[in-house]
């Protein structure tokens, strides 16, 4: 039905009461026993109707799913935005069904997208509320049809709403509170983006609707339509526009969570975000580095690079390492505690790769990086490319939940600094440098920790690498100087922020050796040499209590779990995009440690069973020979 001002007044009153309640619980803990389930999830998604709640839960239980995502979008469909009663009842039913068997469920809702079912009819969001829409600087509204995205059906109107459209936002938050009242365990917010990701909008830096422009002017005194040079990182106005857009999305998601926990203090908020560490983050305005402290988990539909096929079956070996770098970064952004859910796709018709093989390599790679697994059929959120394989993977993860749901404390005396502001303003330069340093460390089996502006003051390692970090606040620069004053070695590559010019003892590599190495690996991964930049490697490498002798195509992450030192290994040897996603088995992997870690090694291969390897004393060290490594393994000392 058309939106009425009478209904708006009622909603506004409820909203005001809700915000009072939300303020009372604003200090709600993000972590704790009530949210421990989020580190244990093995995810699958199901379309929810008014009649299929029990069947969804039955199917989920049968394949080992824990943490059921259901699709029954209320605010993302204009009709249910206005009248949510039927969908709210369906959500209540699936929550009851999931809880009856000890499972958890959370419901999908759109962020800033809203679809009206009849684009030609009079009752669409765009027709009734054109002032709610995001717009290009030219005034063109963010309104689309079926040709723009696969999820838009013929005859539907798809629009993207400004988060500053206050009447819409009031209704939206009321719907959030109603959803929280159903007993569902979480709200899964998809695509909370500024419209910059559909064809023709990539460089728009939207939105320039009246409400957004007014909010920016109030905050900065600048007219976004006239006073900024879009795309110019040297322009202070454009930098303010980038920061404003990111902060707006942060505030939107934080408000969703406040409203949800006001009704149900145990409610979880999980945004789905596809940009990771790359330039898409400032472009769409959803920066996972900034979002992790504000939400309970992030579901990363993580992909990057050119082309449309980012499935596991089509990944190059270089890609596999870049995904490791991304996932390790996400874990650091969440302080290693907030769960990282990875919605990646294993296979979508690659003729030379078996779906099961791609699924296994993908799942193994995510587990060793500390992420939760979510694979689906093709490029949709639901289904599976091979249900028996998914069932096998999920049951194995469940059997070893004590390992894969535990909080990890990464080990390593080398720290690599992630600068969100540098990435926001100079993404190409920073990301290449950051990846180059981390790839060099990974392939040389040097353990590292990712350091962020939020964890810099606590970093107690020996070496801190700043890869082309061009933008630091005074506080951040002071933190780097304090690290050096404590005896730490600071390594600066590329262009460093001028605030570090006075650091005479810093080791500098202004000619970008890390980027040279990255480019060689990108061009021919197997022919590139991770020791080809010896001066840089010597400057950033540090020793560890554990030394691993293995192929450079084997990734090793060292961490402490519950007081025990563990190694997580992933094998990417022999992989070829679109041809082979089954790694070549690795033999003769040796691990050398000091005696204090013990002389017994436990080895748990991916999808296998635990076995014990006894170490051989060799002077002051103990040496272990691992059994053949297929895809991945976890090992720990005793």
Model-derived features with residue positions:
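Carbohydrate-binding surfaces of carbohydrate-active enzymes
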Residues: 250-268, 274-275, 292-638
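Short, acidic/polar
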Residues: 45-62, 166-179, 280-290, 355-363
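Catalytic domains of carbohydrate-active enzymes, especially glycoside hydrolases
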Residues: 51-76, 181-186, 297-298, 362-373, ...
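Active-site neighborhood of glycoside hydrolase catalytic domains
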Residues: 167-294
